[in-house]
């Protein structure tokens, strides 16, 4: 009987290392992987216009624009009258959070935004993205929350234009 029980316990031990290598992902890991997928899909969409509609559908994209008259210290974004593919700001809903990214037209019209020391970019994205120059075009999303008739920028993102 002691031989049978020792065999059984060694079988149990041999199964546990296999489970350790296939442990389920934590909610944080799942969220991080999904966020990485969002960023990858975003980069594909801004580089290839034919992928924009699929991107919009997959990530529940909304076209936003800055509210014309801002009051106080908060920046408000409202629904844009432009189509998603033509809007300057894309809102994406992910993990019950809202993020604002520069739309594909921002990258394709980079020269206009960069003129006169980024005057157009500073004006159009004030309070939404800080504007900098760097080695290449890149964007970090703004964090939004629902508020009133639109969204409030909780944390501005960063928009980098090439030098």
Regions found by a protein language model. Give the residues of each.
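Long, compositionally biased intrinsically disordered regions
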Residues: 3, 14-17
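Short intrinsically disordered, low-complexity segments
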Residues: 8-11, 22
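Charge-dense, E/K-rich amphipathic alpha-helical interfaces
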Residues: 17-115
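Heptad-repeat coiled-coil alpha-helices
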Residues: 1-9
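Extended, amphipathic alpha-helical stalk segments that mediate dimerization
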Residues: 96-163
């Amino acid at each position: 009987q002691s031989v049978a029980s020792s065999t059984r316990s060694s079988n149990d031990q041999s199964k546990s290392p296999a489970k350790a290598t296939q442990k389920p992902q934590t909610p944080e890991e799942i969220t991080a992987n999904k966020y990485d997928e969002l960023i990858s899909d975003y980069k594909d969409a801004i580089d290839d216009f034919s992928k924009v509609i699929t991107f919009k559908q997959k990530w529940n994209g909304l076209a936003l624009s800055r509210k014309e008259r801002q009051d106080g210290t908060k920046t408000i974004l409202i629904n844009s009258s432009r189509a998603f593919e033509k809007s300057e700001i894309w809102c994406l809903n992910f993990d019950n959070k809202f993020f604002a990214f520069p739309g594909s037209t921002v990258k394709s019209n980079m020269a206009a935004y960069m003129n006169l020391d980024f005057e157009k970019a500073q004006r159009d994205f004030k309070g939404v993205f800080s504007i900098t120059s760097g080695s290449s075009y890149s964007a970090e999303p703004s964090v939004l929350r629902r508020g009133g008739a639109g969204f409030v920028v909780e944390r501005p993102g960063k928009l980098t234009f090439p030098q």
